[in-house]
Structures are given as C-alpha cells and as structure tokens.
From Swiss-Prot:
Keyword Ribonucleoprotein: yes
Entry keywords, A to Z: Ribonucleoprotein, Ribosomal protein, RNA-binding, rRNA-binding
Job description of the protein: One of the primary rRNA binding proteins, it binds specifically to the 5'-end of 16S ribosomal RNA.
Protein name, entry field: Small ribosomal subunit protein uS17
Cross-referenced NCBIfam families: PRK05610.1, uS17_bact
PANTHER family: 40S RIBOSOMAL PROTEIN S11 FAMILY MEMBER (PTHR10744), SMALL RIBOSOMAL SUBUNIT PROTEIN US17M (PTHR10744:SF1)
Length: 84
C-alpha cells in the first residue's frame, strides 16, 4: 500500500538563508476544556532550490527525505506572491 504524500500550505516568514526558507503553518485546534478554537502556528524549515520564494508568499510544500538537520520539506509551488 502506498503512503500518501503530505502537503501543507503556509506563509514564508524568512528567506535569509541560501536555498532555504522558514514557513509558518497555521491551524485551528479546539481547546479541550473550553471548546474555543485557538490558532496554533508551526514553523518549518524548507528547501528552496532556486531561491524563488520571498517573505509573505503563500506556498505549498511537501515532505521529503531529510536534507539537513532541520530541513525535511521541499517547496512545490508558489500559490500567491506577496505584493509588497
């Protein structure tokens, strides 16, 4: 049975590294006691081979083999460019 490839969408928060970027993934989680939905943010380091993403871009990433100590996600495509 084949495993499903994990893909996520997020905003680029930093691209100061060469061929790398930091992406913030936002998700809503229900509080176990109060029932309110709370926004949680996860930061992931991604591999950007062509240095094409910039801060504020909405991008799609997929999981891959470990590329370095902290990078195990690869840029698939840029969904929306930042206009600023």
């Amino acid at each position: 049975m084949k495993e499903k490839i994990r893909t996520l969408q997020g905003r680029v928060t930093s691209n100061k590294m060469n061929k790398s970027a930091v992406v913030a993934i936002e998700r809503f989680v229900k509080h176990p006691i109060y029932g309110k939905f709370v926004k949680k943010t996860t930061k992931l380091h991604i591999h950007d081979e062509k240095n094409e993403c910039s801060i504020g871009d909405l991008i799609e990433i997929r999981e891959s083999r470990p590329i370095s100590k902290t990078k195990s996600w690869i840029l698939v495509k840029i969904l929306e460019k930042n206009i600023f």
